[in-house]
Amino acid sequence: MFVSYRWLQEYVDIKDVTAQELADKITKSGIEVEGVEVLNKGVKGVVVGHVLECEKHPEADKLSKCLIDIGEEEPVQIICGAANIAKGLKVPVAKVGAVLPGNFKIKKAKLRGEASHGMVCALQELGIDGKLVSKEYADGIFIFPSDAEVGADALEILNLHDEVLELGLTPNRADCLNMLGVAYEVAAIYGREVKLPAIDLQETAEKTADYISVSVEAKEENPLYIAKMVKNVKIGPSPMWMQTRLMAAGIRPISNVVDITNYILMEYGQPLHAFDYDKLGSKEIVVRLAKEGEKIETLDDQERTLQSHHLVITNGTKALAVAGVMGGADSEVTNETVNVLIESAYFAGQTVRRTSKDLGLRSESSARFEKGIDPTRTFEAIQHAAALMAKYAGGEALEGVVEADNLQVQERTVSVTADKVNRVLGTNISASEMGTMFTNLKFPFTEVEGTFHVNVPARRPDITISEDLVEEVGRLYGYDHIPVTLPSGTMTRGKLTSAQTKRRKVRRFLEGAGLYEAITYSLTSTDKAKQYMVEPNEKAPVALALPMSEERSQLRLSLVPQLLEAVSYNVARKNDSVALYEVGSIFLPTEEGELPKEEQHLAGVMTGLALHHAWQGEKKVVDFFVMKGVLEGLFDVLGVSNQITYAPAKREGMHPGRTADIVLDGEVIGFIGQLHPEAEKQLDVKNTFVFELSLVKVFGADAEETYYSAIPRFPSMTRDMAVVVTKETKAGEMKQVIAEAGGELLKDVTLFDLYEGEKMEEGKKSLAFSMNYFDPERTLTDEEVTEAHNRVLTAVEEKFGAELRK
């Protein structure tokens, strides 16, 4: 909201307060002033000039040689390139020595051999935004009214000796989306009175009701509609003071009639619309819901297709305007308009908001209806508009209005005690001081033994509960005046929970392993909701009652589908190597009508290269063992590695030979594996591996304690063993048998090679293990190690039918 400092002074006496002081005070009262703009931008030396003579430049077709009276002893010659310069006009002239925006100084000059003692200015050259300049002057110089005084300060006439405050309003303060609302706020801050606009309306004997009737079919969407006739208007420019105020408010002047409706909008916050009465096509206004597919061409020359929940203003058959959003081109006020029908209405904010969003069309009017307007100003606004049209457009305001009034404005009384105000704010404000504040706010009230019963005016729909009144007192008292106190009472040092600590360990380890954290949607589509679940669940996923789209209609049962979407998105954009993880919740359905069970899971996905080609080694492609290694490292960090085993598994969407369940103490807590080739094809990815597991179950396991020991004084001995076994043999089971057979001396077993090449018999594979033997108390002999190693060989031969590879 842009607020002209000089315009504001018409409603509240603040001449003793500078614009910057006012901005600081408003900000401290709870409404942020985002900036204060000085309109003149350092311009000086610009006066009103009267063009006495104007002829073509002898050496240039597009230049004019003008003799201009600027209020000094002698007129001056100025060369001007504007197409609309002409004899007899009064124009803004920057004299020699004048300063324009950007510290541009005007000097004597010669243009094509002719002397020029100044510059005739366009509004843009005086610092006014070109978007706010009326079309009449957009491509030329500005022309003052004929009664402008020659030599007078042009900036004063243009109202540029002004400052504009930009208010950053929150949605609940729609009452300040107009000058009167801001005036009430400022008056409350300074304890001053609000001067309401004087309405000098002279009506004719003819009645508005003789020309138009109004009926409302959609009473819920439009509880109040008022219309008034103004005849015999003469379309032209609005008065200079009105144009400059509108430009200061960020609105481009158009014509006197249209400018008056916009002026009332900015003054009262009441949107108005002016119809060309002679183009209505009937003598009735009917407000109804649109017919599905009904069309209307709006003022922006766009044809709009309406839906059945959109509210329209019609002539009984044809739509004339989209209620609260924008008028129609068919009944637009033009230069030929003679008779005007003014509309002032109260439209339901929800209806306007939905219509505006559907049509992709926002306006100053729709913004105010959406947030809520003061319905008690609707009649006053239309009367003031009619008075201004009679005065500045030469119109004749007909007697009375025609209205359809189904609006019931209920009085709101909100109560609060002085004790509560002081308790919440931490202040010691007396009841009489609070009463003064409510008086300054223009809130009528009664006080009974320290309890205030406040009648809230309709202009403040944000005041509904006692806490709102506490806030009002706090704002006017000044948040900067509230005493500063330190928290009292026993202080306890905060700390992370066990789960929070472990989650941080998970993130730190996975990011160290080269995975990036992703945060995906908790909502998914129906067909993806049950994909890649850790545990099968026959119940239907939890669905939203009113989803925004089918793609986001179900609560997820797995993190994997959303991560795969992210991988597919990246691969499609030539980012072929992706490693992502997510810590997030899944939502397990429970009994019907009950909330789902929320369980935290960890999922990851890797595709492409695990190690890019570098000078120190060859590139490494992601495979099952790369991802399994990441998980084993994670389990080791969490202290549960000895409790985790892996079992071959077949899962929907996963590769049947490269998928395993993750088992913790006999319970399946997750899975790891490669996507099924068909799934990879659908996602347009290759060689993609995923895992998902329940963090709740991992964190709930008893973590192994960490022990520290001295550096060994005695050497260890390593023996390698490569055995040939059937392809069905599980390396993990063999590793466990080796560890048991090796006894106390065998400290570590590592699988370092798997071979299934051409030299192996069909159905066979080679597994190679490295075994480390060690005794912390002495040096082992070769015989002791050989004895333990032979036990290992015997165990794997008996258990798995293994043969030493030769």
Curated annotation (Swiss-Prot):
The keyword Metal-binding applies. Residues 40-155 form the tRNA-binding domain. Residues 712-805 form the FDX-ACB domain. Binds 2 magnesium ions per tetramer. Residues 409-484 form the B5 domain. It catalyses: tRNA(Phe) + L-phenylalanine + ATP = L-phenylalanyl-tRNA(Phe) + AMP + diphosphate + H(+). GO terms for biological process: phenylalanyl-tRNA aminoacylation. This is Phenylalanine--tRNA ligase beta subunit. The gene is pheT.
